[in-house]
């Protein structure tokens, strides 16, 4: 075997070893995005919900800033309940359909049905809640503190 071939083989092996250490991506976020688009009939891009208020996006704390942010807190809480049932919401794939009336969850196992129900409820909530541009990309350290933490900061 030529030395160049050995180098290529070594590079492939190292790449595969590195890839095996990467944690799984949140696969069902693609499905959640599709449910959101179905529920709001494509009127607002899903990205607009990824950094909104105190709960829409990664993490969450404090008091939701409005109805839309409450949808996200409820969704986070629902995923927490799914975890208590032994489900892994961010990687649970499920069946759903986008029908003229609204999106609907399809058949599946207990975790698939539960996670789909969480996502469906949130998507429908997003569709009916007003979107306030002032709550996009807010300073969560200032506006999303818990009451106890905020009181400690003022003492």
UniProtKB/Swiss-Prot annotation:
It holds the Pfam family Phospholip_A2_1. Its cofactor is Ca(2+). Its EC number is 3.1.1.4. Binds 1 Ca(2+) ion. It comes from the Eukaryota. Ca(2+) binds at residues 55, 57, 59, 76. The active site is at 75, 119. Expressed by the venom gland. One of its GO terms (molecular function) is calcium-dependent phospholipase A2 activity. Residues 1-21 form the signal peptide. InterPro entries: PLipase_A2, PLipase_A2_Asp_AS, PLipase_A2_dom, PLipase_A2_dom_sf, PLipase_A2_His_AS. It is an enzyme of class 3 (hydrolase). GO terms for cellular component: extracellular region. Disulfide bonds join 38-98, 54-144, 56-72, 71-125, 78-118, 87-111, 105-116. The keyword Signal applies. Gene3D superfamilies: Phospholipase A2 domain. GO terms for biological process: arachidonate secretion; lipid catabolic process; phospholipid metabolic process. It catalyses: a 1,2-diacyl-sn-glycero-3-phosphocholine + H2O = a 1-acyl-sn-glycero-3-phosphocholine + a fatty acid + H(+). Residues 22-27 form a propeptide. Snake venom phospholipase A2 (PLA2) that inhibits neuromuscular transmission by blocking acetylcholine release from the nerve termini. PLA2 catalyzes the calcium-dependent hydrolysis of the 2-acyl groups in 3-sn-phosphoglycerides. Belongs to the phospholipase A2 family. Group I subfamily. D49 sub-subfamily. This is Basic phospholipase A2 PC9. It comes from Laticauda colubrina.
């Amino acid at each position: 075997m030529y030395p160049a071939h050995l180098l290529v083989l070594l590079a492939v092996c190292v790449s595969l070893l590195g890839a095996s250490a990467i944690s799984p991506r949140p696969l069902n976020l693609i499905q959640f995005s599709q449910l959101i688009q179905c529920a709001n009939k494509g009127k607002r891009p899903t990205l607009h919900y990824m950094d909104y208020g105190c709960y829409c996006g990664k993490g969450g704390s404090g008091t939701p800033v409005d109805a839309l942010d409450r949808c996200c807190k409820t969704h986070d809480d629902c995923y927490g309940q799914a975890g208590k049932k032994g489900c892994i919401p961010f990687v649970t794939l499920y069946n759903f359909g986008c029908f003229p009336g609204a999106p609907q969850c399809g058949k599946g196992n207990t975790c698939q049905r539960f996670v789909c129900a969480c996502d469906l409820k949130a998507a429908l909530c997003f569709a009916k809640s007003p979107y306030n541009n002032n709550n996009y990309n807010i300073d969560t350290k200032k506006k999303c503190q818990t009451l106890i933490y905020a009181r400690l900061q003022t003492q």
